[in-house]
Structures are given as structure tokens and as C-alpha cells.
Curated annotation (Swiss-Prot):
Its cofactor is a divalent metal cation. This is 5'-nucleotidase SurE. GO terms for cellular component: cytoplasm. It is found in: Cytoplasm. Belongs to the SurE nucleotidase family. It comes from Methylorubrum populi (strain ATCC BAA-705 / NCIMB 13946 / BJ001). Keywords: Cytoplasm, Hydrolase, Metal-binding, Nucleotide-binding.
């Protein structure tokens, strides 16, 4: 099995190294095509106004000056065009990609691009808690990643579907199993704009979430990782809401 590995945190990110290790538990044919620089939050964007620069870092390892979607396209349609990968793995992201994160995530987008190109694809992210990124427990994803991927491949990934996997903020032995979960929803009232001024008095802003108690919904990815379970969420490329499609069609016919 040929595996293409990408991410959005960049070619030198520790999560990419973690995912390479996971991939090598599954296959000895692992290729890496990742962004030259951090592309967190770029979602499914493409570089349409700038050329893509490709740099070979080492054997089977490439960096692209572009987005995660660019990287997957370059990997599938250029670097590996004569022998396409059988699986695209994107991650391991530095931080969870649950709830609304899915719409912003470059990690999810890397898997999404693989799905668009007709290749099975899985996005993987490692949550962190109050200790912040400095105390991120990569060992959790490293210990459980290969087994979760094997199970997903055994179940099968249908065309047009990608799978989002989130590892909880705990030690490997503290994981309470796997929860197949729906995409959750945060309390958006907690989103704040933090206004500041630089040394010259010019304003600038940070987006931030207020710290407040929040009870995630049952059966969601948010709930799963809060309970130290690995959240597995199938996502569909087709964003059409079928019930609403029927309702709108009936209304326009009236």
C-alpha cells in the first residue's frame, strides 16, 4: 500500500513526524508532501495567484510552498503520477479539529483533496488541554493511530467520504476506547475579538475564545474527546442538505 502523508503545520512539524511513524506501521512505501511553512486555518484553499515551489527534502520527502490542498495535488498528480497513492493521511494536527474547526482546517482539507482525487483519505489531530501546545501528548496519537486506521480501512471508506480522527488530551493508557461521533457545535458566544495597540498606537486584533464552562452534546466529537475517547467522524464532500433540498424545491414550485 502506497501512502501519501501531508499536513497543515508544515514540513518540520512534530505531528508530521508522528504521522510518518504511524504510516510506517502500515506500509514501507510512505511518501511525504507537506507545506514549506505553517498553513494552519487555510481550509481548502488553492494557490491560484502564486506559482508552487517544490523542494525535495530527502528521499520520498518533499516540501511545497503552498497549501495542504496544493500538496496533495502535487503529490498525486506530479510526484506520484505514475503510481498513485492508495491512501492519503493528513496530520497529525497540533490541536483538535472538531465541531466548526472542520470548516477552517487545512488538515481536514488535505484529506478532502485526496477524497476529491478518488483516494481514500483520513485526517488525524491531537487535542491539547489547559497545558497548551507545549504539553501536547503526541504519544497518544502515536500509540493508537495505526490501529484506528487499520480498523477504518477494514470497515471501508466509500467514495465521496473522508474520515476525521481526533485523539484526546491524555496518555495512551488513559484512552477510553473509540467513539464514532457526529460533528459537534461550540457555543459561538464565547468567540471574542481581543483589541490591542502596538508601540505606535496602531490597533490590531486577535481572535480568541473566552474561558467558560461548556457542556458538549452527547454523541459528538467534542463529547468524545472530553471523555478521553478517540473521536472518529465520517465526513461527506457533498454538503447538500437533502431534507432542506426537498423543502426548498416544494416551496419554489408553489
Amino acid at each position: 500500500m502506497r501512502i501519501l502523508v501531508t499536513n497543515d503545520d508544515g514540513i518540520h512539524a512534530p505531528g508530521l513526524e508522528t504521522l510518518q511513524g504511524i504510516a510506517r506501521e502500515l506500509s514501507d512505501d510512505v511518501w511525504v508532501v507537506a507545506p514549506e511553512y505553517d498553513q494552519s486555518g487555510v481550509s481548502h484553499s488553492l494557490s491560484l495567484n502564486d506559482p508552487l515551489r517544490l523542494r525535495q527534502v530527502s528521499e520520498k520527502r518533499f516540501a511545497v510552498k503552498g497549501t495542504p490542498s496544493d500538496c496533495v495535488i502535487m503529490g498525486v498528480s506530479h510526484i506520484l503520477k505514475d503510481h498513485r497513492p492508495d491512501l492519503v493521511l493528513s496530520g497529525v494536527n497540533r490541536g483538535q479539529n472538531v465541531a466548526e474547526d472542520v470548516t477552517y482546517s487545512g488538515t481536514i482539507a488535505g484529506a478532502m483533496e485526496g477524497t476529491i482525487l478518488g483516494i481514500r483519505a483520513i485526517a488525524l489531530s491531537q487535542a491539547y488541554g489547559a497545558g497548551g501546545r507545549a504539553n501536547l501528548k503526541w504519544s497518544c496519537a502515536a500509540a493508537h493511530g495505526a490501529a484506528v486506521i487499520r480498523k477504518i480501512l477494514e470497515i471501508g471508506i466509500e467514495p465521496g467520504i473522508l474520515v476525521n480522527v481526533n485523539f484526546p488530551d491524555c496518555e495512551p493508557e488513559e484512552v477510553q476506547g473509540v467513539a464514532v461521533s457526529a460533528q459537534g457545535q461550540r457555543n459561538q458566544a464565547l468567540l471574542q475579538i481581543d483589541a490591542r495597540h502596538d508601540g505606535r498606537g496602531n490597533p490590531y486584533f486577535w481572535l480568541a475564545f473566552a474561558k467558560a464552562r461548556f457542556e458538549p452534546g452527547n454523541g459528538t466529537d467534542l463529547k468524545a474527546i472530553a471523555e478521553n475517547r478517540i473521536a472518529v467522524t465520517p465526513l461527506r464532500l457533498d454538503l447538500t442538505d437533502e431534507p432542506e433540498l426537498t423543502r426548498f424545491a416544494a416551496a419554489f414550485r408553489a
